[in-house]
Amino acid sequence: VIFLTIIVRFYYGQEYNNTTFNLARMNMLLHDVNYTRFKIDNDDTLENPAFRGEKFDAVVANPPYSAKWSADPSFLDDERFSGYGKLAPKSKADFAFIQHMIHYLDDNGTMAVVLPHGVLFRGAAEGTIRKYLIEEKNYLDAVIGLPANLFFGTSIPTSILVFKKCREDSDNVLFIDASQSFEKGKNQNHLTDEDVDKIVETYRNRETIDKFSYCLLYTSDAADER
């Protein structure tokens, strides 16, 4: 989590893919997290959530982009989705993951999720969900545009969306364009330590930097555009 410093006493996670599930557990051990300090469930996060009734201080994810899911109408009665009036489409589960994560986020917690740019502008049900999150709840805290070809298996550009339920800066949203902040590698692009530090400091200070970041204040006109 690059946006805040916290003391983590216990880690919870859920991953459907067996290989990624095992890699996640190995990653914990390689970073000196004792097996008694984490619980990672191997199941479908959307269809069979593992930690009902829990709330978490920090929620982070890099879910599969625009994955298919059931979008079963019965989910409209599920507490994770019921307040929105719409479900993410079967062909794109991006907003279903966002809704799932927000449900499990503590009121004073921070959530960060990596998703393709389409979540920022697609319409229909996704537009309804996005409008509810921004206009009704005012949960969106920042959008950080990342370089293309940053993650293994995909070359598409992505964004980090940061959400908070109780925002200190509730009258604005910070936009950071870090799409040109990378070091080109043989097969993938990489964020350098300097790139990461600049993103983190810009987020913490909520600075407007020419051609890099902009803090959008919610005026009456901006509210109409949300």
What is the predicted role of each segment?
Residues 3-9:
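Conserved S-adenosyl-L-methionine
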Residues 21:
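Short alpha-helix immediately C-terminal to the canonical SAM-binding loop
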Residues 49, 53-220, 226:
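A conserved structural/catalytic subdomain of Rossmann-like adenosyl-cofactor enzymes
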Residues 25-51:
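S-adenosyl-L-methionine
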Residues 10, 37-39, 142:
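Conserved beta-strand segments of alpha/beta enzyme cores
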Residues 11-15:
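Conserved SAM-binding motif I beta-strand of class I
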